[in-house]
Amino acid sequence: MGLVEFHSGAIDESIQHYQRAVSLEPRSYSGHYDLALAYLKAHKLEEARTQLELAVSLDPRRADAAYDLGVLLLEMGDPSAALIKLRQARALDPQRADVSFNIVRAQLESGRVNEARTEARESAKRFGSDFQWNAAVGQLFLEKGQAKDAVPYLLQASRVRPEDTEIRHQLALAYLESGQANEVLDTIPTAETSDDHYMRASAYYIAHRFPEADQESQLALAMAPENPAILILRTRLLQRAGEQDDALVMAQKAITLAPNWDEPYYLAGVSYYFIRRYEQAEASLARAVELNPKSARALFLESIALANLGKVEDAERCLRQAIRLQPGDARLHCHLGILLARKNESGAAEDSFRKAIQLKPDYGLAHYELGKLLVGSQQLRPAAQELELAVKDDPGLTAAYYQLARVYTKLGEKEKSQQALAEFERLYQQEAHDSRAVDQALDDDARRATELR
């Protein structure tokens, strides 16, 4: 009776019948298993878990109960426990593609990325011709931020069903997110839809083929003028072209269409920053961080905007938060050093500059800032060495030549001083105040950070 009511949609009544059945036969595998399915249908997950655990304990040779319990544990946020049950189900029935898929899923959700890669690779030997398995595993890797791992499975799915447009687009997206621009263009050789144009434009963008990216993105926007992703790409292209006002228009439209997406707020903050509207930049970037607290790039640029507003303590807080998120980013350590130097915390600033150089030995700005700091403490020879490295690593760092000329003068190396000053004047083509040159160097460094996608 419970089964009839279950299939007729009378879930509450079927639960009552199954409850009576298991009270009469408490050791009935099918009774507990069917009651679990009814609880699942009613979204009563804890009750379903209890019944599935009873079913598994009553008959550990049944793959269905072990599998369903594993999937339920995944849904309840316990991937490690789910993995045990899913492996149990596979041992009982190794031919099930759904079990293989969910093992990979459990491994990814528990942070065992290498195990997931191995599992998928081994399972492909058995399910490699299965379209659904390949498509599902590829999409799973893509959703979990492992685009490069998604490629072989989506590629195989596309080979099995070359006419499947959705899989072709998923494959193109995996190529795009793993930085394989040429493969995107090969996957979508001609554009018929706005998505096609967007994918091709994005591929040209990451390949630094900006004229083609501009053309394709305009075609995409003409076909889908209210697509936030296309608007964001147009914003980036306009920013690279220095058209910050037009970029802001695009970013603001994207904000209207996707108010809970951090990206348009971040890009609006970028444009506000480069047109020196620091208060608006800080507000927009703060909103981006609110929506995505793990956005180190938004925290970085927010810190620079705050510093320009004279809010050094708030700027330092943002930078330290960014460093906690990305401790291996040399730029963050360098700019923290700049802030600390402004606060006259020379020892801590020096530590930050040296950390930046350790992470990125050819980072010209870090060498420059360290050299300038050493000048202040009269360590002239080490300062000269750092400034020499600065101009070697970044020949366009004009302020470094100015500082180097001053240091050489103090060291009594007149010829070297004249050469450094001549190079400074050649780059500037006129006398320039050191602080203005430094501001330009910081702006250039910030711009490079915004261009890292």
Predicted features, each with a name:
Residues 304, 331-376:
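Alpha-helical adaptor scaffolds
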